[in-house]
Amino acid sequence: MSIVLKIKRTEDAKDLPLPAYMSEGAAGMDLYANVKGEVTINPGEVELIPTGIQIELPPNYEAQIRPRSGLALNYGITLLNTPGTVDSDYRGEIKLIVINLGKQPVTIKRGQRIAQMVINQVVRPKIIEVEELSETERMDRGFGHTGV
């Protein structure tokens, strides 16, 4: 099934690439940092990094914004609210809440691939309140119930 994702660049991001899939089987398309020059994030610091894009999703779709694994592994750079959700009725610029969990300052440069965006279909179920839920073998055994 094919859908259309409409993308508008902000005025200050006309020179940046559009989001792109980096391999044939990639689930997420890379997003680019729309910073002026560069931004250094010290260990433990949080920065709001703009992407320079606004999107229009079809109804009943969302965009999930996720960290890039290489940045997390090599530098401790990740997204604070992951995955971030972009709703189909949001039209503002996508911005990333980036945190440095590493031990060294990390410099983010303009145009650097900083996160990835995955498009998913959304199901909105009818919600009903009940007095009981059906029984399962697991029931309410949660965290660590299958072993560590």
Swiss-Prot record:
Catalysis: reaction(s): dUTP + H2O = dUMP + diphosphate + H(+)
Pathway: Pyrimidine metabolism; dUMP biosynthesis; dUMP from dCTP (dUTP route): step 2/2
Binding, substrate: 68-70, 81, 85-87, 95
Keyword Ribonucleoprotein: no
Gene Ontology biological process terms in this record: dUMP biosynthetic process; dUTP catabolic process
Family of this protein: Belongs to the dUTPase family.
Descriptive protein name: Deoxyuridine 5'-triphosphate nucleotidohydrolase
Species in which this protein is naturally found: Caldanaerobacter subterraneus subsp. tengcongensis (strain DSM 15242 / JCM 11007 / NBRC 100824 / MB4) (Thermoanaerobacter tengcongensis)
